[in-house]
Amino acid sequence: MCVGRLIFTYEIELGILCKLERCVTTIKDVYKREGLPIYYRKAGGRYYKIITKIPTHSSAEGELKVREKYQSLVGAALSSNLFYWFWLIHSDWHNLRSSELEMFPIPFESFSDEELDKINTLYDTYLNDLYSKSQTTKTGLKCFFARQSKMHIDAIDKFIGEKYGLSEIEIKFLINYDYQYRNAE
């Protein structure tokens, strides 16, 4: 199925995209020059996008600054299976560009303070697990193995998916998207 320049393998993908397009706010809307940082790997990464609050000091690392209130929400959303799928349909499959981050929709105002606390807990749990399973190279760079923390990524999707109006079937589709590649050793 083809919509514009986007090609979908499954009909469910069009429904997910339509729900994302209903969201009128994007990450760009919460950029703040003096905000809190979110770090991301600009190149490589294959089947996972590693998004953290702490820099790795890699030459392939990018940074964006967002309003303090939304740092964990942005980090969690960009770590989600939903963002991975969104990135695949909008990218060259190799690089993570700031324009792809900026255009990702997040329904910021639909999250209550309690829900922001919950997403902060989910994201911190994921990051703690991610770091506990990471390795440091001889040159001092962190190597992450996100597939070992996938259950925490899935928990993020289950929580934020409802805010996009995604059905349980759509959330399961995203959680299992590219599963055979994303979980291979």
Q: What are these language model-derived features?
A:
Residues M1-E21:
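Flexible, glycine-/basic-rich loop-and-beta segments that form/coincide
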Residues R22-E185:
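S-adenosyl-L-methionine
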